[in-house]
Amino acid sequence: MANPVESEQYQPDPLIDSFLDDLWSNRGLSDNTLSAYRTDLCHFDRYIQSVGEEVVQVSQALIRDYLDVRFDKGFARASSARLMSSLRRFYGFLLFKKLIEADPIALIKSPKLARKLPDSLSEAEVDMLLNEPHVRDPIECRDRAMLELLYATGLRVTELVSLTMEQLSLRQGLVRVVGKGGKERLVPLGELAINEVEHYLQGARAELLKGKLSDVLFPSKRGQMMTRQTFWHRIKLYAIRAGIATHLSPHTMRHAFATHLLNHGADLRVVQLLLGHSDLSTTQIYTHVAKARLSQLHSEHHPRG
């Protein structure tokens, strides 16, 4: 796994790879998550090597020095919070393996972060976005089916692009999703999503594959699994074409799915199951989005707002 902090002069401590191998084999984390851990740990390792130390010799004071250096360089609080999370897990691993006697990061507090409300789209904006791709073009027909499926299910983009044909049952109106840590969940499909996916499967998918065999539900024009970055760029393209000014992220449709369900009275625990959240508190942030939207509508449209 390549990393921008590595160079011919810098050699990461082998314990970093041991830690990442353990995460990969025992935790089932995604390549993106493992890459983030590697980036954080290699940046830190590079710093401690520059002051003549090794990861197993790190002191609490040295970690604080590194955090001060990051602060002076203008790193965001969110970036430092992620770094602290990576270091806690790494040094927890070293402690478990008895490679260190004490955890140097145990008493260091992570930077406090204001909980950011996720960006979402209004129902009208979702309609504009979903209607933008042209169904006569095979690529846009695929994209339209993907967008409908995304909004109908609240999948993560990574989960969407990795779907296979066997995970989909249009007859039952269900999709079997493999989420974080390999956890599976069944998510129902709405009628509109079923219709769009059926239309796509009747012609556009075969045009994209051009005779190639593949079990990928939504292949790229080369017949391979699409990357999440590619699909993200496609979403932005349609948003621009539709004239949607709302800031978009790869999770915008997932946020819209959750927020709109809650706005229409869905139970929070049902939304938690559909999203694949292991902790209800993760889902609860969407209740704030829903309330914020209702407050905005009240102030805009109520005669005494």
Predicted regions and their residues:
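Conserved catalytic core of the tyrosine transesterase superfamily
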Residues: 1-305
